[in-house]
Amino acid sequence: MLLDAGPQFPAIGVGSFARHHHHSAAAAAAAAAEMQDRELSLAAAQNGFVDSAAAHMGAFKLNPGAHELSPGQSSAFTSQGPGAYPGSAAAAAAAAALGPHAAHVGSYSGPPFNSTRDFLFRSRGFGDSAPGGGQHGLFGPGAGGLHHAHSDAQGHLLFPGLPPEQHGPHASQNVLNGQMRLGLPGEVFGRSEQYRQVASPRTDPYSAAQLHNQYGPMNMNMGMNMAAAAAHHHHHHHHPGAFFRYMRQQCIKQELICKWIDPEQLSNPKKSCNKTFSTMHELVTHVSVEHVGGPEQSNHVCFWEECPREGKPFKAKYKLVNHIRVHTGEKPFPCPFPGCGKVFARSENLKIHKRTHTGEKPFQCEFEGCDRRFANSSDRKKHMHVHTSDKPYLCKMCDKSYTHPSSLRKHMKVHESSPQGSESSPAASSGYESSTPPGLVSPSAEPQSSSNLSPAAAAAAAAAAAAAAAVSAVHRGAGSGSSGSGGGSAAGSGGGGGGAGGGGGGSSGGGSGTTGGHSGLSSNFNEWYV
């Protein structure tokens, strides 16, 4: 049932909910009189005796809460004088019967109602304001003098969160034709003005008659969570800047220039094609059709400007097509694995790359006893140098060579860190290099230093040489060298200058053994490292 907003709507949560028993008879009489007047007004509205704008208005469906509103909010519905609205005589009688409690009832006072039930409150209508300081376009002409003015300090009762009005050229952009965007789903708009009179009539191009058949009653459940609805609307509302950025990206066009030089040109110097294209597909199609030609072409030469091949032909057309991608930048083979994003110019490169995702290693080392496997044949070829002792990767700054390019790159860092290229740095040692580590060099490698040593130091050096000779004998299997070195060591430890000299000789022999032993050790270490 659609109730009228006048005598049926009391001040929400104020005195109308707490009735007093000694006024029940007067309230019942007022309710009966008010119901009779309302039925007469509704019947007259159906017969066309009252203004259509006053009879047909939108409505808000309200679910009043159990708590009471503050006096400041309840004062939004101020008192009105008798005779301002149909049925006001009954309202005046009810106010007189209530006596001292009449202050608790607002201008829309009426009979009490059950707070647990829903009621309807008529929303403000649309229409031109009455001339001569009438209502501000809220109701029809017949209801222009219903409300008194309200102060600007009062807040909205239905939507307390609405910001205050702004006037002048800097008014809020959310206010359009007296309507404010409430931030609710469905683009609901509400009036930003309060219930008050204005000095001048509102210039509204839409009259009440025009809007009568366009806007029906609007029901809105006020028990919903307003804050959650506004947050939901804000979350799904995209900022307009994202759209403009997207459109700007679509408007940016690439300029791909064809640099193919026609060899049949008579001019000198010859000029390139210089045709521009907006997409890579257009450029590739142009080069394939206009310059490369079909299967009738027997000479597959790249005539792209500044091509490093310098006119050297290809054996097949597909090889020329693959080569042209170096100039055009075309990479038509993307990696299908999600999140990778890599693209390739050749299908075989994509095939090799996909093995990094699948873990496939189909290329096994061909050397007997080695079970190393690789994802591509080039890595296996580099690995084979470990077994064949080939060291094709030479250092350009020194005479060292390596079996793998990664070892050469590590070695080049030594030259970058030390400009003099010191070869005694431990960082220069690698499993692939052929030089002797400095820690295993025999003291006899520097014969000039042994003559300046004391007898005790010479004996210690001879002992170290004997130990090195023993290591050499283990790797070489030569027992005679070990015994000779041991004899030299014993002679060196016997004392005297001659003993020192004998120790030096033994040290020398041990040095040669150490060198040979290290060769075998280095070879074994290379196999283990790789």
Curated annotation (Swiss-Prot):
Any GO molecular function: DNA binding
Chief place where the protein resides: nucleus
One GO cellular component, as annotated: nucleus
Domain of life of the source: Eukaryota
Post-translation changes: Phosphorylated.
Entry keyword set: Activator, Cytoplasm, Developmental protein, Differentiation, DNA-binding, Isopeptide bond, Metal-binding, Neurogenesis, Nucleus, Phosphoprotein, Repeat, Repressor, Transcription, Transcription regulation, Ubl conjugation, Zinc, Zinc-finger
Stretches the record annotates as Necessary for interaction with MDFIC and transcriptional activation or repression: 100-255
Nucleus in keyword set: yes
Biased composition (Gly residues): 478-519
Gene disruption phenotype: Mice show impaired dorsal forebrain development and insufficient closure of the posterior neuropore. Mice survive with holoprosencephaly (HPE) and spina bifida.
TM region positions: none
Zinc fingers (C2H2-type), renumbered ranges: 256-291, 300-327, 333-357, 363-387, 393-415
Family annotation (Pfam families): zf-C2H2, zf-C2H2_15, zf_ZIC
Compositionally biased spans, kind Polar residues: 521-530
Tissue: CNS. A high level expression is seen in the cerebellum.
Keyword Ribonucleoprotein on entry: no
GO BP terms, alphabetized: axial mesoderm development; central nervous system development; central nervous system segmentation; cilium organization; developmental pigmentation; gene expression; negative regulation of DNA-templated transcription; nervous system development
Biased composition (Low complexity): 417-435
Residue list for modification Phosphoserine: S192, S200
PANTHER family named in the record: GLIS FAMILY ZINC FINGER 2, TRANSCRIPTIONAL ACTIVATOR CUBITUS INTERRUPTUS
Subunit field text: Interacts with RNF180. Interacts (via the C2H2-type domains 3, 4 and 5) with MDFIC (via the C2H2-type domains 3, 4 and 5); the interaction reduces its transcriptional activity. Interacts (via C2H2-type domain 3) with DHX9. Interacts with GLI1 and GLI2.
Domain remark in the UniProt entry: The C2H2-type 3, 4 and 5 zinc finger domains are necessary for transcription activation.
Family designation: Belongs to the GLI C2H2-type zinc-finger protein family.
Function: Acts as a transcriptional activator or repressor. Plays important roles in the early stage of organogenesis of the CNS. Activates the transcription of the serotonin transporter SERT in uncrossed ipsilateral retinal ganglion cells (iRGCs) to refine eye-specific projections in primary visual targets. Its transcriptional activity is repressed by MDFIC. Involved in the formation of the ipsilateral retinal projection at the optic chiasm midline. Drives the expression of EPHB1 on ipsilaterally projecting growth cones. Binds to the minimal GLI-consensus sequence 5'-TGGGTGGTC-3'.
Protein name per its UniProtKB record: Zinc finger protein ZIC 2
UniProt source species: Mus musculus
